[in-house]
Regions:
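Membrane-proximal alpha-helical signals and transmembrane carboxylates
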Residues: 1-157
Length: 157
């Protein structure tokens, strides 16, 4: 998924927020066998550009700050996706197509419970969400996140 903006609370705990635009991403739904049934792991990897930073913190180009922002944004996205999945399970609807992933991965098992997927299985199916977020640039906020070749040469000298 790309082209949308993620806004999370300020990582320093104060007032304000940080916003990032997703420039590229990939989502994988991985069915697995767990405790005698089907479970899923949703893996999301995204590259983002910081578009707004309303927090008191060091420049985003510093590695520690960038890593902290990546963790905060990843955590926020993980919670939102997990909440969406919980809502769909409570509503007994499968708009993402988890059932189709289960059918492809475990066709014989799925055939035995296909008619009951929505009622009995999907609402109780464990789903783990993992997010890996990488900040590529800070846009106009503080300049590039990664040091330029010139900056690297200056550090070495």
């Amino acid at each position: 998924p790309s082209g949308f903006t993620i806004t999370a609370p300020c990582p320093t705990g104060g007032k304000g927020s940080v916003s990032a635009q997703v420039v590229s991403g990939r989502t994988r739904v991985r069915p697995r066998w767990q405790d005698g049934g089907i479970a899923f792991k949703v893996e999301i990897t995204s590259n983002v550009n910081i578009t707004r930073l309303e927090c008191e913190m060091a420049e985003v180009k510093h590695a520690e700050v960038r890593e902290h922002l990546e963790q905060v944004l990843a955590s926020d996205l993980r919670e939102r996706v997990a909440q969406f999945i919980r809502i769909t399970q409570e509503a007994v609807t499968d708009p993402v197509g988890f059932g189709k992933h289960a059918q492809l991965a475990f066709p014989r098992f799925y055939k035995t419970m296909e008619d009951k997927w929505g009622e009995n299985f999907w609402p109780n199916t464990p789903v783990e969400v993992a997010v890996k977020m990488t900040v590529d640039q800070a846009g106009l906020v503080t300049g590039p996140v990664h040091p330029t070749e010139r900056e690297l040469r200056e550090r070495v000298q």
